[in-house]
């Protein structure tokens, strides 16, 4: 069931942000990351909007590849988690120009024994320091040669890694990871891909044949301590919901579950049809900003499943039906995430089935 709360998706802002990525990495091709429903923005709509600007799309799983191909999306697809078994691998081959990432010897064993309808392009992922997915860098040459020799594989496997600390450019880990990657792959053929959003913007040495911008495409900052606006990123998602009631409260009145917020003076409160069931962070504290009639107001009390309360004492004329902006245009999602003790990625991805996605541009 859809609620009155909605997320407006500005596709022109999305395209602007991809152009920002291209300017930051002018010698690289762009593998736009659209996994997890394009960080909550709607994978198919985002893929169609970027089809003329991106060079490929990065996705998480084969289910996403299937959805894109069935919808007529034809750009190359790189499956970051690769495949689980032979059945998935066969489906990848049938979908056409879907490129799985190989990050384990188990996947390589499956690839070697699979009878595929067509050879695949693949990527070899090296674990240079994040210690999540990837094979040992010291084995890169042996592994690449082993993969390239297979009849199931078309061409030379690409080489990729993922950066653990690129969002904090002053830390040494990114430089160390690049050194490990370069030492392991110096004499090897194949295209390279390293840079995520943060590295695209602040680590030119990581921008190789392909870059993989993700969060920056959606207008949030990937860098600790830097705003999206300062990075020439425009908000793509603006979440808003209507006021459903306005109440006058007396000094001493407590608001919400637990009564943790107590009015210190008479206040005017607006109840808004948005809650954690819609993807708003439950842990957002009192004082977290929202926008009402273009002015900043503050949350009062705990966020409920379907509602939250806002202090509109200083905003005259607020009435049921008025729109309240929870994040987006004029109110950066990074600011709301920081107030709630989380990251913008989580908020954007949390916008679930109850909200309408409305596309403009």
Swiss-Prot record:
Substrate binds at residues 132, 305. GO terms for molecular function: alanine racemase activity; pyridoxal phosphate binding. It catalyses: L-alanine = D-alanine. The keyword Isomerase applies. It comes from the Bacteria. The active site is at residues 35, 257. Its cofactor is pyridoxal 5'-phosphate. Pfam families: Ala_racemase_C, Ala_racemase_N. Keywords: Isomerase, Pyridoxal phosphate. Pathway: Amino-acid biosynthesis; D-alanine biosynthesis; D-alanine from L-alanine: step 1/1. Its EC number is 5.1.1.1. The keyword Phosphoprotein does not apply. GO terms for biological process: D-alanine biosynthetic process. The modification N6-(pyridoxal phosphate)lysine is found at residue 35. GO terms for cellular component: cytosol. Catalyzes the interconversion of L-alanine and D-alanine. May also act on other amino acids. Belongs to the alanine racemase family. PANTHER family: ALANINE RACEMASE, ALANINE RACEMASE, CATABOLIC-RELATED. This is Alanine racemase. The gene is alr.
